[in-house]
């Protein structure tokens, strides 16, 4: 379970443990993982803590191999880790963009590559990638995040075909708006840009902040999404895609049906991007 120190990852780890799984918790914040592991064990479960920065290939390799050593086998891999800095492309360096892809996409694919041989030897397994509704909704100031999630969605569909001969099921869980620290972290990471009066994107940042606050009023909790992930992990025949909530599917379909020019006009109005 990656990204297990908070939000969807933490909630899913707790629910998977309650469902009878022994869980391996992967994230950067070791102290927080230790607390979660102790609480899981106090409730009768078993948890292994694996501290790793998934942007680092060697740490990612070490984490999954330690997980395999600790668990003996891997029945379910949940790729949940992800982040978004909330800045314009011209305000980001290439290394910063690469770092987003390292965590949101490349680490997930690397982990699949590590567990696939083991799952094949076991006679099967299950891989669950956590995507985002943002992959269906173009937005400014989140281009690397959106791009990484679009790539993860497509990769998940291709992985499902690549691994089907060995009884390895691959599912994509697509959450809508979820009340997690992702939005706060994105705001904090770009706070210096919000405070810069010469930042040409400052007004757009405030508009997006207001939209995020409104969306969070009716957002799902991490536990809501975790229940969907557990369903994908335990279903006899898991679906290729799960949406949380169902309205996320409707939004995705609606956005996909609109001609590009109409979609641009709609989003330009929503994001208040008319010529300034």
Where are these regions (language model features)?
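Conserved glycine-rich cofactor-binding loop
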Residues: 5-6
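Conserved glycine-rich Rossmann-like NAD(P)H-binding loop of the short-chain dehydrogenase/reductase
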Residues: 19-36
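The beta1-alpha1 cofactor-binding region of Rossmann-like NAD(H)/NADP(H)-dependent oxidoreductases
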Residues: 30, 51-62, 94
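Substrate-binding pocket helix/loop in short-chain dehydrogenase/reductase
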Residues: 88-89, 96-98
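Active-site helix of classical SDR
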Residues: 112, 148
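Residue(s) in the substrate-gating loop at a strand-loop-helix junction
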Residues: 132
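C-terminal beta-strand-loop-alpha-helix "lid" module of Rossmann-like NAD(P)-dependent dehydrogenases
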Residues: 164-216
């Amino acid at each position: 379970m990656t990204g297990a120190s908070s939000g969807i990852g933490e909630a899913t780890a707790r629910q998977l443990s309650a469902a009878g799984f022994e869980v391996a918790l992967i994230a950067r914040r070791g102290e927080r993982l230790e607390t979660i592991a102790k609480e899981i064990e106090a409730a009768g479960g078993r948890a292994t803590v694996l501290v790793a920065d998934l942007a680092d290939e060697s740490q990612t390799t070490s984490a999954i191999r330690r997980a395999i050593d600790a668990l003996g086998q891997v029945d379910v891999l949940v790729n949940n880790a992800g982040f978004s800095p909330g800045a314009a492309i011209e305000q980001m360096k290439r290394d910063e963009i690469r770092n987003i892809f390292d965590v949101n996409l490349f680490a997930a694919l690397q982990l699949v590559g590590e567990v696939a041989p083991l799952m094949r030897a076991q006679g099967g397994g299950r891989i669950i990638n956590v995507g985002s509704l943002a992959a269906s909704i173009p937005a400014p100031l989140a281009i690397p995040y959106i791009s990484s999630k679009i790539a993860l969605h497509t990769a998940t569909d291709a992985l499902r075909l690549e691994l089907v001969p060995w009884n390895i099921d691959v599912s994509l869980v697509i959450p809508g708006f979820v009340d997690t620290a992702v939005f706060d972290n994105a705001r904090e990471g770009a706070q210096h840009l919000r405070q810069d009066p010469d930042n040409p994107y400052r007004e757009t940042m405030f508009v997006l902040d207001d939209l995020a606050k409104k969306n969070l009023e009716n957002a799902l909790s991490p536990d809501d999404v975790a229940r969907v992930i557990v369903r994908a992990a335990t279903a006899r025949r898991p679906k290729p895609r799960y949406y949380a909530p169902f309205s996320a599917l409707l939004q995705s379909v609606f956005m996909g049906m609109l001609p590009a020019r109409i979609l641009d006009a709609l989003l330009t109005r929503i994001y208040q991007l008319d010529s300034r």
